[in-house]
Amino acid sequence: MIEVVVTADMLVEARDKAAEMGKLRNSIINGAGNIAGFIGEAIAQQVLGGTLTNTYDYDLVLDDGTKVDVKTKQTSVKPLDTYECSIANLNATQRCDHYVFVRVKNDFTVGWYLGSYPKDQYMKDAVFMKRGTIDPSNGYVVKSDCWNLPIHQLKEHIYATQ
């Protein structure tokens, strides 16, 4: 897990992009996470390098051509390695090579690059959670069908998929 301070420039750019984008279709929280999502992308780029592309299928293309989709959640505390990362079932068909997971503090002052996981392997190793069920690991009522994997199972680095 890598802690990254959110700079004023990162926050301004994230707010501008979020305003331009508006509410995402199928958003679990009605677009309220757009600013955090764009901050998460900036954090992932700072850690991994590459070029931000912001397509439906992926957000970042690394120098070796690896396509990365960044998944960001907001948090009130530094995440523990037992916390879970999630991929909404609606996004399970995205054409990317790796998922990268980031948490951003609710006040947008700091974020954490949590790690990565190869997309194809993620779907094999993650636990499917149906909307409305209670996640036994944390008591959370699942808002949308999703695939969960604990942070401690992530890999810190992305290895070339080419």
Language model: regions and residue ranges:
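Nucleic-acid endonuclease domains
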Residues: 1-66, 71-162
